[in-house]
């Protein structure tokens, strides 16, 4: 197996010291294929309030677009997936689709580069920012999460992930990003807990096989977006519950309230 072109790296608050050189990374343009692996990239935006949880995303897999949105309105799940680029529109600090229009303030986030197979992957996570606008024709105010990802993932990739926002028993505003399967190295991972906006790298947190727990978090799913596809060289088994969270997080302590998502994805691409 060829040696990956990068070593794992993590940067916070816009810091770029040690950022891998010699390979294209956002915001530079990334080639469509590198080392025989097609480029995958996406922006996923989540927004969470007491009565509504939602996500919207735009992805390209080897140049082929797919967009989706899902909204849990407190009673039922609304969702749509389309294989065309304009159904979800992403702009700096804004996401729009037919049932939603939301604005938020962009920040530097936490940026991570990791080897993956014989190539590499990049991500930037922003979490806990106020997000406002309209959802299903009603005003919305909550807190958001943004996942920007790009890279040349291995042919078979599988991960489990959780992202959310909430309030600690201390009264601190918190957010989290926990993962197993990608960007999960012991020292330079994307695992992060934000406490009043300050990011803290955290050790691995074990995921229950049924996504009912992550570390000391307990997860109560309220609605599940799931999709299974098999098309020629592409196969995907995907599950993403919206959930309420109780329990505790490193650096944040016990939660007074928590809302967010979990995800299990096993894909050949």
Model-derived regions: residue spans:
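Structured soluble/peripheral alpha/beta segments that form catalytic or ligand/cofactor-binding pockets
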Residues: 1-269
């Amino acid at each position: 197996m060829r040696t990956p072109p990068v070593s794992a790296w993590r940067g916070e608050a816009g810091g770029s010291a040690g950022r891998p050189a010699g390979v294209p990374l956002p915001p530079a343009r990334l080639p469509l294929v590198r080392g025989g692996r097609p480029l995958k990239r996406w922006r996923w935006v989540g927004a969470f309030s007491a009565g509504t949880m939602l996500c919207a995303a735009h992805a390209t897999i080897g140049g082929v677009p797919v967009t989706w949105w899902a909204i849990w309105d407190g009673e039922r799940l609304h969702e749509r997936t389309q294989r065309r680029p304009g159904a979800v529109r992403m702009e700096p600090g804004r996401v729009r689709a037919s049932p939603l229009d939301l604005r938020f303030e962009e920040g530097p986030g936490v940026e991570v580069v990791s080897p993956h197979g014989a190539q590499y992957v990049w991500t930037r996570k922003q979490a806990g920012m106020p997000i406002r606008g309209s959802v299903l024709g009603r005003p919305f105010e909550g807190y958001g999460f943004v996942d920007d990802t790009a890279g040349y993932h291995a042919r078979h990739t599988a991960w489990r992930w959780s992202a959310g926002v909430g309030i600690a028993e201390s009264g601190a505003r918190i957010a989290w990003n926990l993962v197993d399967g990608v960007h999960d190295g012991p020292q330079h991972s994307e695992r992060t807990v934000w406490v009043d906006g300050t990011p803290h790298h955290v050790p691995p947190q074990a995921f229950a096989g049924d996504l009912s727990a992550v570390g000391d978090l307990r997860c109560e799913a309220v609605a599940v977006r799931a999709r299974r596809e098999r098309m020629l060289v592409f196969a995907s088994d995907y599950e993403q519950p919206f959930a309420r969270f109780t329990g505790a997080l490193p650096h944040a302590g016990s939660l007074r309230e928590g809302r967010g998502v979990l995800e299990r994805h096993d894909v050949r691409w």
